[in-house]
A protein has these predicted regions:
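Surface-exposed, charge/polar-rich loops and edge strands
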Residues: 1-279
């Protein structure tokens, strides 16, 4: 049984210029709060304090609130309209912002949801491959987990146990989940295509809640209850994603990653994948 995350990467990066100075300004939308309000990252020179009003070439906005590194802003244009008209694909910062790469950062089976980053293991699958798996009597199921920016936030605490993972919205069809449980009892192996799928399935098996938010942080010592195999890319150091690898593979991950490097395998979002056996 292969389970994939169908949440679609939205065009949440807005690049524009200040109307008064012409200075570059970027809005990275993280979450839509209402038609005219969103949570976002802001990148421009100048003050970024509560009450600041900015006029740009595409939208006027006001900073309503500020957290450590995120902002709540109100706009004079609907957020969805901004995304549809001006948004571009939010490639990771270590990938050159080349429009020719945008389609490669979106799985062609994705639909619905609101992800601001890709579930990169799913990028190894396309509709043709999924059809071939189904012809071979493999069972395909889908979850939705809206990938947030927190998924890739580095672990900055001294001990990985002290790290906190941001809440992310997830959902799975109740009947699909029951079928997955039934198939597992019948001896089928459950393959999670990506850490987002792994975290969703493990959240649901523990809570029996089919739609909600999860901040499940998987680290060494975690007891897996449902998933048998994980397909995932090679991850950056000091990340909660690598903590998942550590929980499955142990300290041997370093030798594994060094071996991958020696074979010129590619890391991170557009990189190669590895299959881990969990149970």
């Amino acid at each position: 049984v292969f389970v994939l995350n169908k949440s679609k990467v939205r065009n949440v990066r807005l690049k524009t210029n200040k109307a008064d100075t012409g200075g570059k300004l970027e809005i990275f939308i993280l979450n839509i709060i209402s038609d005219y309000e969103c949570e976002c990252l802001l990148n421009f020179s100048g003050k970024k304090v509560k009450g600041t009003e900015i006029t740009t070439d595409i939208v006027n906005f006001k900073i309503l609130d500020k957290d450590i590194d995120t902002f709540i802003i109100s706009t004079d244009i609907k957020i969805e309209s901004l995304i549809e008209k001006y948004g571009i694909t939010p490639l990771p910062p270590y990938i050159d912002d080349d429009p020719s790469k945008y389609n490669y950062y979106k799985a062609d089976f994705s639909s619905g949801g609101f992800s601001v980053a890709a579930s990169t293991a799913g990028l190894h699958f396309n509709k043709e491959m999924i059809s071939k798996l189904e012809v071979e009597n493999k069972i395909i199921k889908y979850i939705n987990l809206d990938v947030g920016i927190g998924t890739f936030k580095p672990i900055e605490s001294r001990f990985i146990e002290d790290h906190k993972v941001h809440n992310e919205n997830y959902s799975i069809n109740k009947n699909d989940f029951k079928e997955i449980l039934k198939l597992k009892k019948e001896g089928y192996k459950i393959y999670a295509v990506g850490t987002t799928v792994l975290r969703t399935l493990e959240t649901v098996i523990k809570t029996n809640i089919f739609k909600g938010t999860t901040d499940l942080y998987i680290k060494p010592g975690y007891q897996y209850e449902l998933v048998d195999y994980l397909i995932t890319n090679f991850h950056a150091p000091n990340s909660s994603l690598l903590s998942i690898v550590l929980s499955i593979y142990g300290e041997g991950w370093k030798e594994l990653y060094m071996y991958a490097q020696s074979k010129n395998l590619k890391f991170l979002s557009f990189g190669d994948a590895v299959l881990f056996k969990i149970t």
